[in-house]
Design a protein with these regions (language model features):
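Catalytic cores of the polymerase beta-like nucleotidyltransferase superfamily
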Residues: 1-346
Length: 346
């Protein structure tokens, strides 16, 4: 396995001083998937003060970035490396964070607390890949599986539910059945997680190649984090312009959209107003007049809850408000819309 030379140096310095050290988590997973390994986290048996002393003696800048959880950050040639002491977590509070952290000397204990088997591997050039939970096999078979008891993992940190969905979307992996069941059993715990953390995972999910399947299969989870979408799940569109119900249409437009987070978020929310304005004429044809304007206001409520940036808020709400307005496009209409809403929205 190839690691950035500075990561190798840090691991070697710790080994030379009698401590174990490994690259852990996502970088090991990505290497095995033959993907770029840009973000290397290091786990070690050395306590933070020992890590700091050893690396500073080698002329490396070290910052105390999370001492409570055993983390310091080393900076070499502009590259940042988080180095965390092996640990086991105490009881979790509110499905968010452990109340206590105990430092340990065994990499096995450290890996056992991690979320999914594909993220619970470690590596150094002396020992090779340490895989205690079948992560390599799950990578080979395209499976997302919780480490140990999935109910316990999700009760520890409910954001792991969104991480499972995100990995399934981005990697195209299937979520293992026991893990899937635990997701549905524990999805209400997402109400304990900050909206910003949920939005960060949702954005990554939307950018995945497998987003349509995940949004479909795990719609009940999406309904927990965006309850405004739930009326769309079974809202029929009986008219000549649609082959899916509202939610089916929504998720397929997400998949068809360019991989731009503003565009894909717009697609997720663009028809959210349809159930509120649905009417059916005497021929049994469904209509959704004013749904764009109504949907833009609902989307604003969703985005305020997620505390999105002003740029995302303005662009998404504007695109939703006007998404039904441009038909039979020609040069004159394009110029008119450029004048009305600005080039950034066209």
């Amino acid at each position: 396995m190839f690691l950035p030379k500075n990561a190798e140096k840090i691991i070697d310095f710790l080994y030379e001083n009698g401590y174990k050290a490994y690259a852990v988590g996502g970088c090991v997973r990505d290497f095995l998937l033959e993907k770029p390994c840009d973000d290397v986290d290091i786990a070690t048996s050395a306590l933070p003060d020992k890590v700091e002393r050893i690396l500073k003696d080698e002329g490396i800048k070290v910052f105390e970035t999370g001492l409570k959880h055993g983390t310091v950050t080393a900076v070499m040639d502009g590259e940042h490396y988080e180095i965390t002491t092996f640990r086991k977590d105490g009881d979790y509070k509110d499905s968010r964070r452990p109340e206590t952290v105990d430092f340990v000397t065994d990499i096995a204990e450290d890996l056992s607390r991690r979320d999914f088997t594909v993220n619970a591997m470690a590596y150094n050039h002396s020992e090779g890949i340490v895989d205690l939970f079948g992560g390599k096999e799950d990578l080979k078979n395209g499976i997302i599986r919780a480490v140990g008891d999935p109910d316990k993992r999700f009760n520890e940190d409910a954001l792991r539910i969104m991480r499972a969905l995100r990995f399934s979307s981005v990697l195209g992996f299937t979520i293992e059945e026991n893990t899937k069941k635990a997701i549905f059993d524990n999805m209400r715990l997402l109400n304990n997680i900050s909206a910003e953390r949920i939005f960060a995972e949702l954005t990554k999910l939307l950018m995945g190649d497998n987003a349509v399947s995940v949004l479909d299969e795990y719609r009940q989870v999406i309904g927990v984090i965006i309850p405004e979408l739930k009326p769309c799940f079974d809202c029929v569109q009986n008219n000549p312009w649609h082959i899916y119900n509202v939610y089916g249409h929504i998720i397929h437009t997400v998949g068809a959209a360019p991989k731009d987070k503003i565009i894909r978020l717009t697609m997720l929310l663009h028809d959210i107003g349809k159930p509120q304005v649905k009417t059916t004429d005497e021929k049994g044809i469904d209509h959704f007049k004013t749904h764009a304007a109504v949907g833009a206001e609902i989307a604003k409520t969703v985005m305020k809850r997620f505390k999105v940036s002003n740029e995302i808020y303005d662009k998404v709400s504007t695109l939703i408000h006007y998404h039904q307005s441009v038909e039979n496009v020609d040069d004159i209409r394009i110029k008119r819309w450029l004048s009305k809403i600005g080039e950034d929205y066209m």
